[in-house]
Amino acid sequence: MNIPFPFSFPPAICLLLIPGVFPVSCEGIIGGNEVAPHTRRYMALIKGLKLCAGALIKENWVLTAAHCDLKGNPQVILGAHSTSHKEKLDQVFSIKKAIPYPCFDPQTFEGDLQLLQLEGKATMTKAVGILQLPRTEDDVKPHTKCHVAGWGSTKKDACQMSNALREANVTVIDRKICNDAQHYNFNPVIDLSMICAGGRKGEDDSCEGDSGSPLICDNVFRGVTSFGKCGNPQKPGIYILLTKKHLNWIKKTIAGAI
């Protein structure tokens, strides 16, 4: 199946989606703990050639990362806890339309956001619910406690996918630290549209299979998992901040969709 993409992007300066690589060696939540089944009702499992995750933000819209590979015939599974078998509470959807943020830059990962319009609308149940977008576009201050969920490896040296949804606690790190020579060294630049966050000496982190997962800080949806180095404390997880510009794009795209 070929997923349709809109053709109304601004020219030249805004790059179209091309498959990106999460620069890591394995997939999934590093460390963390398994969550109680169906307690993260907003989580969307995007199952194609590779796994990604996302957040259900309306009955037929999922927000994820632009670099997620949608080749093949991907499905969006809502209400999932296990990746290995179908559950009674699962709701499975094909993707009607994939709309990457028009200024996504696959080299720097700036604007690494993507909206997926589902074929059909989700039914709200005890396993499926909507994650509200933030009401304000405030920055997230250093030392803020956050959490991120996903499906994947529990150890950075073991790349076997986990069967269950797991969650890691991470703490926001000052961008000056993330950009210094001991961390990303401005390659790429961690700018004001990104959040840098890591766990206990790299023991808790997000990873490739978690791309697109929502970052929740103080019970507010603040960012989308973009890239990192899977538990490497020198390369903490980077999340796309839901800025005013990003939120306006999300709302206008959903309002203007057919």
From Swiss-Prot:
PROSITE patterns, per the entry: TRYPSIN_DOM, TRYPSIN_HIS, TRYPSIN_SER
Any one cellular-component term (Gene Ontology): extracellular space
GO biological process entries: cytotoxic T cell pyroptotic cell death; granzyme-mediated programmed cell death signaling pathway; killing of cells of another organism; negative regulation of DNA binding; negative regulation of endodeoxyribonuclease activity; negative regulation of oxidoreductase activity; positive regulation of apoptotic process; protein maturation
Transmembrane segments: none
S-S bridge residues: C52-C68, C146-C217, C178-C196, C207-C230
Active site: H67 (charge relay system), D112 (charge relay system), S211 (charge relay system)
EC numbers on record: 3.4.21.78
Propiece residue ranges: 27-28
Top-level EC class: hydrolase
Protein keywords: Cytolysis, Disulfide bond, Glycoprotein, Hydrolase, Protease, Secreted, Serine protease, Signal, Zymogen
Cellular localization per UniProt: Secreted; Cytoplasmic granule
Domain (Peptidase S1) ranges: 29-255
SMART domains, per database record: Tryp_SPc (SM00020)
Catalysis performed (reactions): Hydrolysis of proteins, including fibronectin, type IV collagen and nucleolin. Preferential cleavage: -Arg-|-Xaa-, -Lys-|-Xaa- >> -Phe-|-Xaa- in small molecule substrates
One MF term in the entry's GO annotations: serine-type endopeptidase activity
Family in the record: Belongs to the peptidase S1 family. Granzyme subfamily.
Function: Abundant protease in the cytosolic granules of cytotoxic T-cells and NK-cells which activates caspase-independent pyroptosis when delivered into the target cell through the immunological synapse. It cleaves after Lys or Arg. Cleaves APEX1 after 'Lys-31' and destroys its oxidative repair activity. Cleaves the nucleosome assembly protein SET after 'Lys-189', which disrupts its nucleosome assembly activity and allows the SET complex to translocate into the nucleus to nick and degrade the DNA.
Assembly and oligomerization: Homodimer; disulfide-linked. Interacts with APEX1.
Protein name listed in UniProt: Granzyme A
